[in-house]
Amino acid sequence: MRKNKTVQQLFGSRVRKLRKLKGWSQERFADECGLHRTYIGAIERGERNVSLNNIHAIAKALDISVKELFDY
């Protein structure tokens, strides 16, 4: 883990990378997750401390395990 980034920033960068690999906009991704687009943006910028329920929703939408979200 890089010392100069917070866990939220690392997680957000990982989510953004995986979303872009799917070719999804933030709006499409938010719809797939059942979350709001501005919330997804805040996650990707590392501004939110994401709940376990929302982590699960993100992993499910991306069709990956929760563990894979933390492979940064």
Named regions from a protein language model:
Residues 54-68:
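DNA major-groove recognition helix of helix-turn-helix/homeodomain DNA-binding modules
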